[in-house]
Amino acid sequence: MNASKASKKRKAVTRDVEEEAGVFSGDELNADNLDGALSDNANDLSSDEDDSDSEIELVDEFSEDDEDDEELDSDEIPSDGEDAVKKKSVTTTDKSGEIAEDAESSSEEEELDFRIEKDANGNDRFIYDEINPDDNSEYSDVEENSNTIGDIPLSFYDQYPHIGYDINGKKILRPAKGEALDALLDSIEIPKGWTGLTDPSTGKPLELSQDELELLRKVQMNEIPEEGYNPYEPTVEWFTSQQEIMPLSAAPEPKRRFVPSKHEAKRVMKIVKAIREGRILPFKPPTEEDKEEDNVINYDLWADEAERPDHIMHIPAPKLPPPGYEESYHPPPEYLPDKKERKAWEEADPEDREQEFLPNDFGSLRRVPGYENFVKEKFERCLDLYLAPRVRRSKLNIDPESLLPKLPSPEELKPFPTACATVFRGHKGRVRSLAVDPSGLWLATAGDDGTVRVWELLTGRQLWSVKLSEEDPVNVVRWRPGKDALILAAAAGDDIYLAVPPIVDPEVEKASLDILDAGWGHAASVPALTPAEANKKNNPPKWIRPSSSLQESGVCAIIPLRYIAKSLSWHRRGDYFVTVCPGSSTPASVAIAIHTLSKHLTQYPFRRRIKGGGSPQAAHFHPSKPILFVANQRSIRAYDLSRQLLVKILQPGARWISSFDIHPTSSTASGGDNLIVGSYDRRLLWHDLELSQRPYKTLRYHRKAIRAVKFHPGGRYPLFADASDDGSLQIFHGSVTGDMLSNATIVPLKVLKGHKITGELGVLDIDWHPREPWCVSAGADGTCRLWM
């Protein structure tokens, strides 16, 4: 306000005020009793106290608290604009005449800003004029958007054009809403403090002040809204951090801290007594019958929950690969890097490393420390999940049968043996070996009874028999190749017997005897051994003549090997045959022997044991090359006899090789060598020497060990078979072509069953007819069977 307006005085008529209840004394309040109490204003008010008009000067220097205590003798409630009148407070009395006189006497002062009217009861009512504040008035600071209707929801006036009433009872009209043009202008030029919201108390647009905007900015920026607040005030140690040596209290520990409580013991005994009397029963879960009696209903919150279908573009995240052995806290030694590998890993760039860590051996799980790259790996996994694009790969609907090779039907591959035609009975005990002669007329068998028998193949009639040993079984029997002579070789005990059965024409029999007798003259021409050579242990044996009884039976020569031979194989020309003694007590230098029929000569080609794979098991000559194949327990070696060199080593992968056979057309029309190998671990393996040292095919069709395998001789029929201890034979089709780009075709054809399993042994040997698709098998049940 201006100084002139501030210095103006205003007179008002006082009225009698009743005594308040809070005043205990009956004396009136007198100015004399306040002597010295208001010493600061005593001089200023001394001149005014003597005035006879009893004027009360209301100066702006009075405090607002004193002004608020004054009451208005009016029926109206002052409005917000009328609050400024309190700065010029006027106290009036109930006498209107005095007011009028005072108003006339104060002509120098302003006219009063109210008028007096009569209300309905005839009392005086003061009506104040509206205040028009100017720039010099503090009423200009009234907030324009302030709520003047009180705490009343605006929803009460939704059906009315106004939103409430002001202090004088006038309707406050609803603020006009901006049209589309105003909204466009507001969006272009955003006014200061604009929020785009509506104040629910006034219905007007909500505008924020600068302080409120600053408060919101601090909250958004995670700053402290309050000014002057220090979040890092020094710590106040309410409890000292210094450890005291002496206790604060030296009182001894009370006895109640280490003595059981008697009151608790009494309560426990009461509970125990109640349990014993049956008044307290242990909790038992209610049965379903009790629940039904109590009508207990259990509601399943997720009973009707339906699975939410995934979004049409949802692609599940790819799963992480399972951990390997290198991620174990105690990995195998082969996974642990050595110093060289560790140094190479540390010097390599992180992008060039095969793995992000080096395997370590901690011994036990409790010694495993924290993984330092755990957070990094999880973070990279999260990056891959939400940043890397995903592609839905359509699964290939492939019929599993289409992946199998298309094999011809067995009906198209006939002929092959399908049924048993003849059964040969006569041996006592197991029949260990058999062989069909090159003409296909006779069958020779050998068994545990020490005899060799010759049968007519088609009829099953026994034609000849000879007993070679009383104690030892005959392990193997083989016919000499060629039709010009008929010579049978049999291994019984430590000896090899060469016989000519008297079942053929005299001409063939004479030719056979001449071949055997020619060797005696050559053996006689060999110079005798020196005493030094005679003292050697492993000298080649000399062929001897049999006893007279054996000679009458047809045995012509005996080769004393001194060790048990279990494998015998002829060369294709019929002048050589090789024997193998697989016993563990057999010296390595005499385990394999090559015998020359025309010279009655025995040679030991190996002076040392074959490296790796154990003792030798079988040996065969190549059908067209001077190559000898020798099989030990785990490998097969090919030796060139002309050059005396090791040609190739085959690794079938079997634990124990039992037998093997060479394809009869190897290196002729087929363009390569093919072998089949049988093993005691139930595997039948096909080897193609041109492909690899490993087997081309591995067949596992038997439940027990495979004893013998055999190709069809001559190559007329692409058949081969195997014999197993499970009492069955399996016939296969195995065709080999001369095309180097095509592999052998192997088709299972037939499973032949007829032999009985005796002593955990089944079929012990097998052989083919030289011209027909017939095969003959020898069983542990003492019989042989012809399959046609």
From Swiss-Prot:
One Gene Ontology cellular component annotation held by this UniProt entry: nucleoplasm
Signal peptide, first to last residue: none
UniProt keyword annotations, A-Z: Nucleus, Repeat, Ribosome biogenesis, rRNA processing, WD repeat
Top-rank lineage group of the source organism: Eukaryota
SUPFAM superfamilies in alphabetical order: WD40 repeat-like
Disulphide bridges, residue numbers: none
Stretches with biased composition (Pro residues): 321-335
Pfam families: BOP1NT (PF08145), WD40 (PF00400)
Span list, region Disordered: 1-118, 321-344
GO biological process, one term: maturation of LSU-rRNA from tricistronic rRNA transcript (SSU-rRNA, 5.8S rRNA, LSU-rRNA)
Gene3D superfamilies: YVTN repeat-like/Quinoprotein amine dehydrogenase (2.130.10.10)
WD repeats: 426-465, 469-509, 611-649, 652-697, 701-742, 758-788
Residue stretches of biased makeup (Acidic residues): 46-82, 99-112
Assembly description: Component of the NOP7 complex, composed of erb1, nop7 and ytm1. The complex is held together by erb1, which interacts with nop7 via its N-terminal domain and with ytm1 via a high-affinity interaction between the seven-bladed beta-propeller domains of the 2 proteins. The NOP7 complex associates with the 66S pre-ribosome.
Function text: Component of the NOP7 complex, which is required for maturation of the 25S and 5.8S ribosomal RNAs and formation of the 60S ribosome.
Protein name: Ribosome biogenesis protein erb1
UniProt source species: Aspergillus clavatus (strain ATCC 1007 / CBS 513.65 / DSM 816 / NCTC 3887 / NRRL 1 / QM 1276 / 107)
The gene coding this protein: erb1
